[in-house]
Amino acid sequence: PSIDTVRPDARVHVFLDETTATLYLDTSGESLFKRGWRFDKGEAPLRENLAAGLLALSGWQPHIPLFDPFCGSGTILIEAAMISLNIPPGINRPFAFERLRNHDSRRWQDMLDKSRLHIKPALEAPIVGIDLDPQAIDAALSNADRSGLDPTCLDFAVGDAVSTPPPSEPGFIVTNPPY
């Protein structure tokens, strides 16, 4: 049979130890932290799942204003907007199981459509990010656009964290500071 070794229909992993061989069928494909929207990265990119984890650990809730004074390519704020709007992570990315022979594409599409019914139309509170680097802000805007978010949903601007006050009070600051 003809097999595409770069992008096979099914990827099988074999793990061996002294007495056992374990076979795994890869149903995810790309790593799950890859949500399918972040192509533009800053100097110190933060994985999308780590950004979502930081937000969860911070105690931030969608009804509370959020500010990132070192937003870079916007990962934390885009994840926050997606959480706030109830957009499932990875809803727009392909998965490896979609190429499997017994995949029911109609059922999968029905599940995606049902999950989209729960997406909220607007944020409950402002989500604002600034960065000194205009290229980082351009990257954040591009990433937000690719994520499917309404461009007016997030407020990205070039600014200096030292001289720019948070846009509203009270609120949360969640950031990945430069080092």
Residue ranges and their predicted role:
Residues P1-L55:
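Non-catalytic, mostly N-terminal accessory regions of nucleic-acid modification and defense proteins
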Residues R7-D9, D17-E18, Q61-H63, L123-E124, ...:
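Short, well-ordered loop/turn elements at secondary-structure boundaries
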Residues V14, A140, N176:
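Residue-level signal for inorganic ion chemistry
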Residues E18, A161, P177:
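Residues immediately flanking
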Residues A21-L23, G74, G171-F172:
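Conserved active-site beta-strand-loop modules that form the wall/rim of enzyme catalytic pockets
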Residues L46-P165:
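Conserved S-adenosyl-L-methionine
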Residues N143, I173-Y179:
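Amphipathic alpha-helical repeat scaffolds
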Residues V162-V174:
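A short acidic, Gly/Pro-enriched loop at the edge of an enzyme's catalytic core
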